[in-house]
Amino acid sequence: ILERYSNIASLGEQGVLQNIYNEDNSFVQICNGIEVVGPSKEYVLEVAGQALDSRQGDSIDNETTVNAASVQISIDLGTSKILLVGDASTKAIEDNAKKHQIIQIPHHGRLDHAEELFEIKKDDKDTVYIISDNKGSSSGGSEELISRGKDKGHTIFNTRTEDTKTINSTTYQKSYRVGSYI
């Protein structure tokens, strides 16, 4: 693999790339209260194997192999946690989604990802969902998603269509601004 992707190996030697796993396969803590929580090493290996095998195509779990294994970050707000997932597949984030109270919907709020998350969290109506989107319904964050989610009683913030939100309440000990920073 290193021969085929020597450019990636050389970036790692320059200190640009860092392993998200410690030697004991636990995840790296970025700083106090912020840590990498996924994807699991097993899932990354499954995705990498699929990506390297030209007979299998370049998608896994309804997502491209590049996106499926996006890094997942957990931010501890005190009594609640926020999960940032990039473009990860729902399968890759399922276990972490169950442990978080505020979740970024993958792939800019793509409807199929949102519906799967709503199903995973169906017994938890207090979950807050964030759509990080600046493109509109072509890549996620559609009005249909907002409507469906709110009809089911979910709280959803969309960075494209709403003013910057500050997530705080008596539930959260710390507050963070949620919005687009360009």
Which residues fall in each region the model found?
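Active-site neighborhood of phospho(di)ester-bond hydrolases with catalytic His/Asp-centered motifs
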Residues: 1, 82-88, 99-112, 128-135, ...
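Short, low-complexity, polar/charged sequence segments that are solvent-exposed and flexible
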Residues: 53-57, 103, 122-125, 148-152
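A short acidic, amphipathic alpha-helical/loop segment
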Residues: 7, 92-96, 114-122, 142-148
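Binuclear metal-ion centers of metallo-dependent hydrolases, dominated by the metallo-beta-lactamase
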Residues: 1-43, 65-67, 125-182
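Core dinuclear metal-dependent hydrolase active-site scaffold
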Residues: 21-102, 110, 167-182
